[in-house]
Regions:
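Contiguous ligand/interfacial binding patches
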Residues: 596-606, 650-651
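Short beta-strand elements that form the blades of beta-propeller/WD-repeat-like
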Residues: 302, 466-473, 511-515, 570-574, ...
Length: 651
């Protein structure tokens, strides 16, 4: 027998769907089913100076790279000299003193010199090290080397000359992809991206795509790369605007299976700020992408940026999700989370969460104070100091909130089956609030958050049919069976608050959310028989009307809503007398204080698609369709990829 779900119809009628189930994905690095604990492990080693730029879990060791020169074990005063790279045993949390690989790094932050990237060689017996360095253990070794994973000895059979700094490394099958400032690899021209044989170091002639014409300055650069788990697609971000002769402003996708490799038909204008005038991103940054990661199932990637936030559609100081399979030009992100003016520097996706690090103070903050390059908390913003976990569906901040002394940023985040490692340039993480350090934890430049003790994450999946349709009126809730075509007999439930004041409602994960005529958003728990006490959702200062600041629309006119429904991280709604169907991102959580209403307002329909949503009297979505009440009629339209399909309306 098909499983029954619940839909709700509110306002004159309000439709809600109730369902369950969280997305499950295959591991790319180390996938998790929950968030990690917000309490970092107590005994991880300290990095005394410099900063951590790279973390590589491999075999039974964790390798840490950066610009440091000294490390020490927790609860020990003895300092161990390690220049740019060390290994630790995660079983004991002690530095592995048998592994020695000292590079000519500089812990001075004004000198961009050190180990920037690490990657595991096939077999996990060796590792690749890339960066800006010239010697290893006193002998010449420039930009890229391969080391023994046990003792750090150089593998002399792997000898690849690289003309300038290596910024990122990815091993895919038998190939090592490298990205950076270079113009040649192995004596042959390569502009920012190259591939070599992971065993011999021989240059792969199939990967010869030039990244050229910098956004700013004279030197194009590929800053960050990631490859999908199936090995077909490479995502690149950096200081370039032309890739393989095609316009690609700072972000590009490359088909690395084809021989030769070719630029994929994936193009967006959202990283192009040329036409924004005074709202361009800050000239102090030649490019904006700082890190990218691909989801464990390969379906999407998240790019994080710097650049000084200016709104007007620019993607500076943001985290944004993009679908890997999308094709065409003028593509738009699935979601964007704005810090309001603080940089993001690292990202790692575990399936349960998207972890981002930087020197951010807030998330869900597209408005700031409306002035260029001014970082302030705007309406709807959520405080997150230096590190955060985002909901993969909506991009909104999950409750995970350890707090980190911000510094310049968290530069490396890496997941393992047991948890999450974070590398940075500061010494306090866990309990940090930004207002002081009473009770915060001391972990110099490196911390580990165990998976044990982490809370569940994720939101309910879309609802199928048949379902239960619940209408809200003066007498409370009335339930009917609904298969998408026919309604069953009404059954009065007589609960759910004063239905005459409801303006829109929706079911989500065992909870009934209702928008009221006084502008409040309330919710009740409901187990199918009994309602709990009402709770009020904190709108965090969102205006009671739509307001535009620097081309970003914020505000939530709850009192004017005529219908609502939830679908995959988005809350859709209609307004009285308005022909548009709006949406905003929405995060439901068990604790009412952790519920987040997205600040930014977006339009799904009603602008140029011949659909008119001004007469809605309650709505819901189920089985790939939107259902709404209009007068005496119950109407439907096909709903896919987050938008209704014009031409499919029926009554």
């Amino acid at each position: 027998m098909p499983k029954r779900h619940r839909l709700l119809l509110a306002g004159a009628v309000a439709l809600l769907l109730l369902g369950s189930g969280l997305p499950v994905s295959r591991a790319l690095y180390a996938a998790h089913d929950t968030m990690v604990s917000a309490d970092p492990a107590d005994a991880t080693p300290h990095v005394v100076d410099g900063k951590v730029d790279a973390i590589l879990p491999m075999g039974n060791r964790i390798y840490v790279g950066g610009s440091f020169t000294q490390v020490r074990n927790a609860n020990e005063s003895r300092v161990i000299t390690r220049r740019g790279l060390f290994a630790l045993d995660p079983a004991t949390n002690k530095v592995d003193e048998t592994f020695v690989a000292d590079f000519d790094v500089n812990p001075d932050r004004t000198q961009d010199r050190g180990v920037k990237a690490l990657a595991a060689a096939p077999g996990n017996n060796e590792l690749f090290v890339g960066g800006e360095f010239g010697t290893l253990n006193g002998a010449a070794a420039r930009k890229l080397v391969k080391l023994n994973a046990v003792n750090g000895a150089l593998d002399p059979t792997f000898d690849v000359s690289v003309s300038a700094a290596v910024k990122d490394l990815v091993v895919n099958g038998s190939r090592l992809f490298l990205a950076g400032d270079f113009t040649s690899v192995g004596g042959q021209a390569r502009g920012g991206l190259a591939a070599v044989d992971a065993g011999s170091g021989a240059l792969d002639g199939a990967v010869d795509i030039a990244f050229t014409v910098p956004r700013q300055g004279n030197e194009p650069r590929v800053e960050t790369i990631a490859v999908t788990p199936d090995g077909t697609t490479l995502v690149a971000g950096g200081n370039f605007t032309v890739v393989g002769g095609q316009a690609r402003w700072q972000v590009a996708l490359v088909d690395v299976v084809s021989r030769p490799a070719k630029v994929i038909d994936w193009q967006t204008d959202r990283f192009d700020d040329r036409d924004l005038g005074q709202s361009r991103c800050a000239s102090a940054f030649d490019s904006h992408p700082r890190d990218v990661d691909v989801s464990p199932d390969g379906a999407y990637f998240v790019m994080v940026t710097t650049g000084a936030y200016t709104s007007r559609g620019s993607l500076c100081d943001i985290a944004s999700r993009w679908e890997t399979s999308a094709r065409g030009s003028g593509l738009q992100p699935t979601w964007v989370d704005y810090s309001g003016g603080d940089s993001f520097t690292a990202v790692a996706i575990t399936g349960a969460a998207v972890y981002v690090g930087g020197h951010s103070r807030w998330l869900n903050n597209p408005k700031s104070d409306g002035s260029n390059q001014s970082a302030t908390p705007g309406p709807g913003s959520v405080t997150r100091e230096g590190i955060a976990a985002l909901d993969p569906a909506s991009g909104l901040p999950l409750p995970w909130n350890p707090g980190r002394e911000r510094g310049e940023g968290a530069w490396a985040i890496a997941s393992t089956p047991d948890g999450l490692w974070v590398g940075s340039d500061t010494d306090k993480i866990g309990g940090w609030t930004g207002a002081g350090c009473e009770g915060c934890e001391f972990h110099q430049k490196l911390a580990f958050f165990p998976l044990a003790g982490g809370a569940a994450a994720g939101q309910p999946q879309p609802i199928g049919l048949p379902a239960e349709l619940l209408s809200v009126g003066p007498a409370g809730l009335v339930k009917r069976s609904f298969d998408g075509a026919a309604l069953g007999a009404p059954v009065a439930l007589g609960a759910g608050g004063d239905g005459s004041r409801v303006r829109g409602a929706f079911w989500l994960g065992g909870l009934l959310y209702e928008g009221r005529d006084d502008g409040r958003l309330l919710r009740w728990s409901y187990d199918g028989t009994t309602f709990g006490n009402s709770e009020q959702v904190d709108l965090r200062g969102l205006p009671a009307s739509h307001q535009t600041y620097n081309a970003i629309v914020v505000g939530f006119p709850v009192a004017d809503v005529t219908g609502m429904f939830y679908d995959r991280g988005r809350l859709y709604y209609t307004l009285a007398g308005d022909r548009r169907l709006y949406y905003r991102y929405f995060l439901s959580q068990p604790n009412i204080a952790d519920v987040v209403v997205g600040s930014q307002v977006l339009v799904a329909s009603g602008e140029g698609d011949a659909l008119d949503w001004s007469r809605v009297q309650g709505m819901t979505a189920a089985g790939g369709a939107i259902f709404w009440s209009e007068g005496a009629d119950l109407r439907r339209v096909d709903f896919a990829d987050g938008r209704p399909r014009p031409g499919s309306v029926s009554t």
